Curated annotation (Swiss-Prot):
Monomer. This is Arginine--tRNA ligase. Its EC number is 6.1.1.19. It catalyses: tRNA(Arg) + L-arginine + ATP = L-arginyl-tRNA(Arg) + AMP + diphosphate. It is found in: Cytoplasm. It comes from the Bacteria. One of its GO terms (cellular component) is cytoplasm. Belongs to the class-I aminoacyl-tRNA synthetase family. Keywords: Aminoacyl-tRNA synthetase, ATP-binding, Cytoplasm, Ligase, Nucleotide-binding, Protein biosynthesis. InterPro entries: aa-tRNA-synth_I_CS, Arg-tRNA-ligase, Arg-tRNA-synth_N, Arg-tRNA-synth_N_sf, ArgRS_core, DALR_anticod-bd, Rossmann-like_a/b/a_fold, tRNAsynth_Ia_anticodon-bd. Its main location: cytoplasm. GO terms for molecular function: arginine-tRNA ligase activity; ATP binding. A motif ('HIGH' region) lies at residues 123-133.
Length: 563
């Protein structure tokens, strides 16, 4: 649907063009009002235009307002030096809610749907997933849900680390210790540590490991059989975690691109992009002080070669219009070099197709990198299990009489919701402090607050014997709390646009938290059952329920009908 912001931008753009036809097209600065008493939205362009038109901002604002039709607004006011404050009429808000209700059910479809590839999670075979994989998995899943909701064709790729020197070490160790079949990732992780120690200390073991890497690349039957067993055990463990998190991924590991590596290097050489540096083949770029190494001096390939091959495949074979890779911000330089190389080679048709969705660290309550006391990465499965147990403790504290059946059902939902929301509500670029105590609170900007508002609406339905509130019919907005709730509901597609434009889920969490606050104020100030406005207010309850449910789904959160 046309958002309130885009509708207002269109009106102001036309008004500016009519008032000042000599101006070229400009990007307008229209935002939600900084304070509610100013109105709903404000236009800040008069100050910017004053430098171009050599007129006072207030005179410019007056000229703009003179060309804006008054119909959709209850007031248009010029404030201060030349801010234009807009307040939509209650009748206009009510009519827009009718449209919003219809389109919410179908998703706010993008005008030009695209093929979007989102590469996220990407753990390494033979290693436990740890807290560092949490952000990539949760952020990537949220973005995938949002792109899908607006009609894009999304391919969720798990670019697992399933190739390289580590497998030569493991295969050699398994061969030499005559290990029986491995069924648990814990066993594999322990073997990896032993193999790594041997690799560092024993030069003969190192040579045999390197030989096994070559054997694996050459398709040696025994090496391949062991490699497949290692991958199978690891992927089974990963899938357990993805099931807990309700995350879907299509696995396409690094090994998938092996057949294309030599071809990619040769193609880059044919385009005169490769320079030898100390025997290694590198791609240099003027804008960067270091190159992207695509082939080592010993002839081996590295993860950069794989990433170039993956980018080319995703454009040429997958026909991607957008490619997002969700990894920590520490890899930013690598992905800048990767993009520059793929642009130079023509694998990326233009800038803006590829985005590195970087994110900060997870910290403990002391502000240190989140690790165990012994300094090791915290295993993700253990973290999730702890969240569920702490959620159950919180439930028992609030409801001592809760049944074991309810506890077993609600605990996992509350625990996983809390972890996801705490992560997504932090700006992804920033580090954030992981605190079970904060994320499981029933008040403040938490998953519990959203769920509490949703459950409150379920309570209204139960008391009134309704399966669902009305989703169509006459609607009027009278009271200030109704107006505030209506305006917030109508901003949902606008916030979704912002979330996808900036690739930042915290815009969506902030919106949903604001929506719960507006609904709670509406519930407090506007009597529903038996009032003259019962149907209209139930309509608002229903729209809030559906918007909360949709928004929570986009975050990967689950709802409950009661707490």
């Amino acid at each position: 649907m046309t958002t309130l912001l885009s509708f207002l931008t269109s009106l102001c753009s036309a008004a500016i063009h009519q008032a000042f036809p000599e101006l070229e097209e400009l990007t307008l600065d229209i935002t939600p009002s900084t304070k509610e008493h100013f109105g709903h939205y404000q236009c800040n362009d008069a100050m910017k235009l004053a430098r171009v038109l050599h007129k006072s901002p207030r005179a410019i604002a007056e000229s703009i307002v003179a060309h804006i039709p008054p119909t959709p607004f209850s007031s248009i006011e010029i404030a201060g030096a030349g801010f234009i404050n807009f307040t939509f009429s209650k009748e206009f808000l009510a009519s827009q809610l009718q449209t919003f209700s219809k389109e919410l059910a179908n998703g706010f479809r993008a005008a030009s749907p695209q093929k979007v590839i989102i590469d996220f999670s990407s753990p390494n075979i033979a290693k436990d997933m740890h807290v560092g994989h949490l952000r990539s998995t949760i952020i990537g899943d949220c973005l995938a849900r949002c792109f899908s909701f607006v009609g894009h064709d999304v391919l969720r790729l798990n670019h697992i680390g399933d190739w390289g020197t580590a497998f030569g070490m493991l295969i050699t160790y398994l061969q030499e210790t005559s290990q029986e079949a491995i069924h648990q990732l814990e066993d594999l992780t322990a073997l990896y540590k032993k193999a790594h120690a041997r690799f560092a200390e024993d030069s003969e073991f190192k040579k045999r490991s390197q030989h096994n890497v070559v054997a694996l690349q050459s398709g040696d039957a025994q090496a391949l059989a062991l490699w497949k067993q290692i991958c199978s055990v690891s992927e089974k463990s990963f899938q357990t975690i993805y099931s807990i998190l309700d995350v879907e991924l299509h696995t396409r590991g690094e090994s998938f691109y092996n057949p294309f590596l030599a071809e990619v290097v040769a193609d880059l050489e044919s385009k005169n992009l490769v320079t030898l540096s100390d025997g290694a083949k590198c791609v240099f770029h003027e804008a960067f002080s270091i190159p992207l190494m695509i082939q080592k001096s010993d002839g081996g390939y590295n993860y950069a070669t794989t990433d170039v091959a993956a980018m080319r495949y995703r454009i040429q074979q997958d026909q991607a219009d957008r490619i997002l890779i969700v990894t920590d911000s520490g890899q930013s330089l690598h992905f800048q070099l990767l993009e520059a190389t793929c642009l130079a080679a023509g694998y990326l048709p233009s800038k803006g197709i590829f985005s590195h969705v970087g994110f900060g660290l997870v910290l403990d309550t002391q502000g240190r990198k989140f690790k165990t006391r012994s300094g090791e990465n915290i295993k993700l499965r253990e973290l999730l299990d702890t969240a569920v147990e702490k959620a159950k403790e919180s439930l028992k504290a609030h409801r001592p009489d809760i049944s074991e059946e309810e506890l077993a059902y609600q605990g996992p939902i509350l625990g996983i919701n809390a972890i996801k929301y705490a992560d997504l509500s932090s700006h992804r670029i920033n580090d954030y402090v992981f605190s079970f105590e904060k994320m499981l609170r029933f008040e403040g900007n938490t998953a519990m607050s959203l769920l509490y508002a949703y459950v409150r609406i379920q309570g209204i339905k139960r008391r009134m014997g309704l399966e669902s509130p009305p989703q169509e019919g006459p609607l009027a907005v009278h009271e200030p709390a109704e107006e505030a709730l209506a305006l917030t509901l109508l901003r949902f597609p606008e916030i979704l646009d912002l979330t996808l434009r900036e690739l930042c889920p915290h815009f969506l969490t902030d919106y949903l938290y604001a929506l719960t606050n507006k609904f709670n104020a509406f519930f407090r100030d506007c009597h529903i059952e038996g009032s003259d406005s019962q149907q209209e207010r139930l309509y608002l309850c229903g729209l809030t329920e559906r918007t909360l449910s949709t928004g929570m789904h986009l975050l990967g959160l689950k709802t409950l009908n009661h707490l």
